[in-house]
Amino acid sequence: MIRRFTHFFPAVALALALSFATSASAQDYKAATSAVPVPPEISSAIRALLSPASTSVAGPGGSPYCEIWMRTGIPAAAQPSSALGVNYGTLVEGEVVGAIHFDVAVKDFRNQSVKPGTYLMRYGQQPVDGNHQGVSDYRDFFLLTPPDQDASADILADNAMYVLSRKTTTTGHPSVWSLVPADSAPASLPGAAQNTDENFWAVYFKAAVGSSPTTLGLVIFGHAATP
């Protein structure tokens, strides 16, 4: 039936194919370099550390989704972690790595609601315990914290970071945003790519960790199957 349809009505078949392609494309996430000013609600101490170049992420239909500012020269760990499931072991737990502004209400990697607004991002690792088993194959995360209560650029101990991050959700759990390996990054950065197996979108961009440029992959849409 489909073969007869395409044989006798090639123009209609082509139009349908283009329609499906356009529909799929309209659901894409896209990333581009921008120069949106760092939000004023971030403290001057942290604002001074952030790059003036940002990454703009557009959601389905091209609507504004979020803006990301990474820290210029993120301090590298003196002894990088090589623990199982850690892909970004040169990052230091509790360190300020950047800031993010969401234009719309979003869901984090645990499917928790996060309101539109500006947040700091600190690096953390998923604890190895029964409460987090099966959440992700990868232990690297950015945790959101409220900028009006997180004004110092000092490293935070895990518990202090978790306490602050809990204030960005209504569930009593920190807001976690998964970092994935950069091997699926598009050729041109910044860029976004979909993981169809796990049904999430990640944005990939360069960040300077110590003296080395590092490609990071941050999941910005989609959540763990086992939150």
Each model region followed by its residue ranges:
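N-terminal secretory signal peptides that target proteins for export/translocation
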Residues: 1-6
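Primarily secretory-pathway and cell-envelope proteins
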Residues: 26-88, 144-227
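Short consensus segments that form the blades of beta-propeller domains
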Residues: 90, 131-135
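A short tyrosine-centered beta-strand micro-motif
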Residues: 117-124
